[in-house]
Structure formats: structure tokens, C-alpha cells
Amino acid sequence: MALTAAVKEELSRLEVRKSSVRKAEVSAMLRFAGGLHIISGRIVIEAEVDLAATARRVRVAIAELYGHQSEIIVVSGGGLRRGNRYVVRVVREGEALARQTGLLDSRGRPVRGLPSVVVNGSTADAEAVWRGAFLAHGSLTEPGRSSSMEVTCPGPEAALALVGSARRLGIAAKAREVRGVDRVVIRDGDTIAALLTRMGAHETLLVWEERRMRKEVRATANRLANFDDANLRRSAQAAVAAGARVDRALEILGDDVPEHLKYAGELRVAHKQASLDELGRLADPPMTKDAIAGRIRRLLAMADKRASDLGIPSTEANVTLEMLEE
């Protein structure tokens, strides 16, 4: 599954219980995916999204939070568009919902950015704004030199509001206009990882980080000259770097790490140059390569999330340039 679809699928399944946070997400989603239309003298709200799961999430939230009914219209793909699109439409009480979600102000005028109650909300509200905006019009590319997370915005005011929400989360994002389209862009790999964590896309983060690490190790190996066995060198470097990250992860989590993850981490630290196959054979009872790798990934992800929450250096802080040198 492409990374963008994976993030949206995961976020569409994320359970959020606090009403104010759900409302912030709905407001952002309707603002970034939707529009107000006048049909037969009545205000109609429409929001177009990529996934059926996302459309259902919006529909359920509108019903539970605001008591309004909506319909989902399937738009078949064709031409430049691949796959179906899903339009959530609110016909009855459209104006009431527009006022409740901040699409219209108290005088009935369209709000160009995001409503002040959302902009000035809690940190969890800021996370919800990004979740809603990404579900509406976000994209995530493969990690590498040109990796990026982008959200297409309905206008410059909405883009600046999204940048402000990112800033409140400690995330550096930039608003740009490209060929007349306003976008908010993040290109730094660590920043993308931090925002995926903030939005709640933990499963996709693990996949993204694994691909990122693989590409970084490959790029480092390609830069090494006159080495007879590049694959062996690359594996050894990756193992040493992983050992350093695990060491930091155990330090961050302390006694709060699950026993099975702690055991896998201690194996990695004790045998820093061993391959994953060798670590699996050293385990008692023995484990497969995939099992030991999965536990280490979960340990690192848990520690990086804790570090992000506490505002302290992540596991990457333990990886030094010397580890990648001969």
C-alpha cells in the first residue's frame, strides 16, 4: 500500500473520544476537503475524500457531535483520477453545521482560515487539525532526498493556520504557493516522523522509518570506496547504529518497557555487530529474524514517542558519524 493511503487508512481507524478534539478534526476536514454551496437557496456542505473509511468517519462524527444526517456519494474514477472518490454531503441543516464547525462566522460570512476556537485550542486539538487536514488533502512520499509531507490548502489563510498548528506542536512547516495552489510542506525526515507520531499514525511510522533507515544505510554504503564487501560493511554499520539507538531507547523508557521488548533490546546491545539472524539464534527460546526485528522496531518507536512527549533527544541522538566510518 502506498504511504499516503496507509496513513489515511490508519488515521481513519484511530479512536478519539474527547468531543473537542473530534470537533477540531471535523472542522479541519470540512475546511480542507469541503466547500459551501447554495442549492435552491439553501447552504449545502460537501467534503470530498480519498477513502470510504474516511468518509464514514466524517459522517459518523457529524451525526454524533452535531446531530445532523449526511449522505455519501461515490464518484467513480476516470480520466486523470484513479480510483473512486467519496463525497460527504449535508443538505438539511447545512447552514447550522457550517456555523457549528466554524465554516461561517456569527454573521454568516465564510471563514477563510480555521475558526478561532480551533486555532486557540489545546495541543490535542492542534494534532486533530493536522489529522483532519491530512485526511482531507495530505500526501506522504517515500523517504529519501526528495521525501516530503504535504497538505494542499483551500487558500493562504488556511495554510497559515495549519503552519500555526504545527508550530504549537513543535513542528516546523512551511507554507508555499506552487502554480497558484497553496500548500503546507515538511521535508525534514525527523520532522515528518514526529508529525506522524503526533497525528497517531504509529503503524505507518514504523514502515516509513524502516524504509528510511534502509535507504540511509544504502546511501552510506554507496559512498564507501575500496571496500571489498559492501553488503557486510552496510550490515555491520546498521547493526552498530541500531545497537546505539536501542541503548538510548532503554535509557528513555527505564522501567516502563515491556519485558519482551526489553529482552530483544538487551540482546541487540550485548551483540552490537550481530546480524538479526544471529540475534534470533542467540535468543532463548530462539526467535525468527522478523520477530526480533519487529520487537526492536516497536521498542524504538515507543522510546521516540516518549522522547517527543518529554521534549528530550530521541534514539537517533546516540548514532554518531564515527559509527558509519571505517
Swiss-Prot record:
GO terms for molecular function: DNA binding. Keywords: Cell cycle, Cell division, DNA-binding. The keyword Cell division applies. The keyword Cell division applies. GO terms for biological process: cell division; regulation of sporulation. Pfam families: HTH_WhiA (PF02650), LAGLIDADG_WhiA (PF14527), WhiA_N (PF10298). InterPro entries: Homing_endonucl, Sporu_reg_WhiA_N_dom, Sporulation_regulator_WhiA, Sporulation_regulator_WhiA_C, WhiA_LAGLIDADG_dom. Residues 275-308 bind DNA. Gene3D superfamilies: Homing endonucleases. NCBIfam families: DNA_bind_WhiA (TIGR00647). Involved in cell division and chromosome segregation. Belongs to the WhiA family. This is Probable cell division protein WhiA. It comes from Renibacterium salmoninarum (strain ATCC 33209 / DSM 20767 / JCM 11484 / NBRC 15589 / NCIMB 2235). The lineage of its organism: Bacteria, Bacillati, Actinomycetota, Actinomycetes, Micrococcales. The gene is whiA.
